[in-house]
Swiss-Prot record:
It comes from Neisseria polysaccharea. The active site is at D294 (nucleophile), E336 (proton donor). It is an enzyme of class 2 (transferase). It comes from the Bacteria. Changing D294 to E/N: Complete loss of activity. This is Amylosucrase. Its EC number is 2.4.1.4.
Length: 636
């Protein structure tokens, strides 16, 4: 009787043979001696057992598993053999240095290509600006062909191999990525793998009954099955449609977690996995460095569950990861999981998503601004921040999406806070329905049956810049100081660095009027960017402040890595934490001066250099921070 390890080894050898069977004996002999085959075979030896185990856990009883694997690995070999030499060099470099993403040099930016630059050629022209800001990572949103009109901001993909014609061509994208690499900037794109648009060829052929695409999506003849699923599903966009299904013109029902034009893929069909792996490898060979794995929580469906965060979803992502380790190991995954904090962290791991959005820290930064109290933020940094080795948070202040209050009710309850009541307060505060609020946000997806609501708005609008609040500029700098210094990869939603306000015209566009997130998706404001070096303007003060902090971070190895230790300031308005036993960070979330007492600082050295202020401060006496002031103190 063979052991499981021996069985996997035999399958691996069989599949290697099958990959080469399509070649003539002479071709095969040459391939087997090639460096490409040596590297590919080595990576198969290392990562195929993981791939096999993950797929077996999902599809073990499906007779299509082995033939699917055979086609998948043949596809992976073709992809690797066609990968250009510079990308293969990056593959090896990142295999040898998996912590490249944790360097203090890393600073990210994210933008809509059309809104920021018009098209891909316009974006290429802005590379000198990205270098000026200090970016080493650029997330380009959204790039691919999508339906005209409503498309969830481009996240309803009609083809993963065609750029939206308004932006350019695949050739243009390849040129932009090469130019970014030349400038020392990694390219990040979205991998929207939970769903496609209803106009995707697969969707059209599945709906038409093409046997090659049978069961690529969840299509039901009537409401019997959808009604059973809906009993346990969470409504994501209740304004768009109740439940998780939409009716087709012929009366059938299709699974649409998000919008009626976004059809969920059916991963219980192993050929869907193989098809999406092919799209993933195509993107890798364009030169993409990081794939933002969209909507990771939703990819597996199971009756009687919420169909979120199921074990099979994790297994499938790990299987995609294993394919990438074999055929394009330079490419990392970034998780997008806006779920309970316990579940967010489960997607992050060297074998799953090496980096992941940090929605808890983002939400708690805004919470701390509203309450002026650091208790929830301090708790999260203490117990929920540190990640496994070789992984990192993507720390952000704003994004293209709404703000959801994703802290755990049990965490809030431990501090004597009602999670439900506190979320109601935060929603009222940030949409200016609370006395004394400085924010000018917009409600998003209010659900009257649950009371749930999220918030739209740019950082500048949410900190009070629209009404010239005297503390608005310092609030933005404070928030970004946390993102830049807590450990991991900081991400700037481009426009924030010059204080871009909401687009108040979003509701006048019929393709956007039912989605308030367009409020914080304004076009590039040329006038604001022209002011970025003028310290008499808010744009200049924000830009120069952020640029200074970025330069400090990138020049100082104390910001390397991702781990921290919280420091109790004994002041409810001041957050404190230590990085690498060498840097003590403080941030005052109050509009009044606040003090850390000498007694609290007694274990610290007598003096420390403030990297932001450029001054030496005494730590053997009370330390006062001005309203919204940040200090990064060298203590070793």
């Amino acid at each position: 009787m063979l052991t499981p390890t021996q069985q996997v080894g035999l399958i691996l050898q069989y599949l290697k043979t099958r990959i080469l069977d399509i070649y003539t004996p002479e071709q095969r002999a040459g391939i087997e001696k090639s460096e490409d085959w040596r590297q590919f075979s080595r990576r198969m030896d290392t990562h195929f057992p993981k791939l096999m185990n993950e797929l077996d856990s999902v599809y073990g009883n499906n007779e299509a598993l082995l033939p699917m694997l055979e086609m998948l690995l043949a596809q992976a070999w073709q992809s690797y053999s066609q990968r250009n030499s510079s990308l293969k060099d990056i593959d090896i470099a990142r295999e040898n240095n998996p912590d490249w993403i944790l360097s203090n040099k890393q600073v990210g930016g994210v933008c809509y290509v059309d809104l920021f630059a018009g098209d891909l050629k316009g974006l290429k022209d802005k590379i000198p600006y990205f270098q000026e800001l200090g970016l080493t990572y650029l997330h380009l949103m959204p790039l691919f062909k999508c339906p005209e009109g409503k498309s969830d901001g481009g996240y309803a993909v009609s083809s993963y191999r065609d750029v939206n014609p308004a932006l350019g061509t695949i050739g243009d994208l390849r040129e932009v990525i090469a130019a970014l690499h030349e400038a020392g900037i990694s390219a990040v794109v979205d991998f929207i793998f939970n769903h496609t648009s209803n106009e995707h060829e697969w969707a059209q052929r599945c709906a038409a009954g093409d046997p090659l695409f049978d069961n690529f999506y969840y299509i039901f003849p009537d409401r019997r099955m959808p009604d059973q699923y809906d009993r346990t599903l969470r409504e994501i966009f209740p304004d768009q449609h109740p439940g998780g299904f939409s009716q087709l013109e012929d009366g059938r029902w299709v699974w649409t977690t998000f919008n009626s034009f976004q059809w969920d893929l059916n991963y219980s069909n192993p050929w869907v996995f193989r098809a999406m792996a092919g799209e993933m490898l195509f993107l890798a060979n364009l030169g993409v460095d990081i794939l933002r794995m969209d909507a990771v929580a939703f990819i597996w469906k199971q009756m009687g569950t919420s169909c979120e965060n199921l074990p099979q979803a994790h297994a499938l992502i790990r299987a995609f990861n294993a394919v990438m380790r074999i055929a394009a190991p330079a490419v990392f995954f970034k998780s997008e999981a806006i779920v309970h904090p316990d579940q967010v962290v489960q997607y992050i791991g060297q074998d799953e998503c090496q980096i992941g959005y940090n929605p808890l820290q983002m939400a708690l930064l805004w919470n701390t601004l509203a309450t002026r109290e650091v208790n929830l933020l301090h708790q999260a940094l203490t117990y929920r921040h540190n990640l496994p080795e070789h992984t990192a948070w993507v720390n952000y202040v704003r994004s293209h999406d709404d703000i959801g209050w994703t802290f755990a009710d049990e965490d809030a309850a431990y501090l004597g806070i009602s999670g439900y009541d506190h979320r109601q307060f935060l929603n009222r505060f940030f949409v200016n329905r609370f006395d004394g609020s400085f924010a000018r946000g917009v409600p998003f997806q209010y659900n009257p049956s649950t009371g749930d609501c999220r918030v739209s708005g740019t950082a500048a609008a949410l900190v009070g810049l629209a009404q010239d609040d005297p503390h608005a500029v310092d609030r933005i700098k404070l928030l970004y100081s946390i993102a830049l210094s807590t450990g991991g990869l900081p991400l700037i939603y481009l426009g924030d660095e010059v204080g871009t306000l909401n687009d108040d015209d979003w509701s006048q566009d019929s393709n956007k009027s039912d989605d308030s997130r367009w409020a914080h998706r304004p076009r590039y404001n040329e006038a604001l960017y022209a002011q970025r070096n003028d310290p008499s303007t808010a744009a200049g003060q924000i830009y120069q402040g952020l640029r200074h902090m970025i330069a400090v971070r990138q020049s100082n190895p104390r910001f390397d890595g991702g781990r921290l230790v919280t420091f109790n300031t004994n002041n409810k308005h001041i957050i404190g934490y230590i990085r690498n036993n060498a840097l003590l960070a403080f941030g005052n979330f109050s509009e009044y001066p606040q003090t850390v007492t000498a007694h609290t600082l007694q274990a610290m050295p007598f003096k420390a250099h403030d990297l932001i202020g450029g001054k030496t401060v005494s730590l053997n006496q009370d330390l006062t921070l001005q309203p919204y002031q940040v200090m990064w103190l060298e203590i070793a």
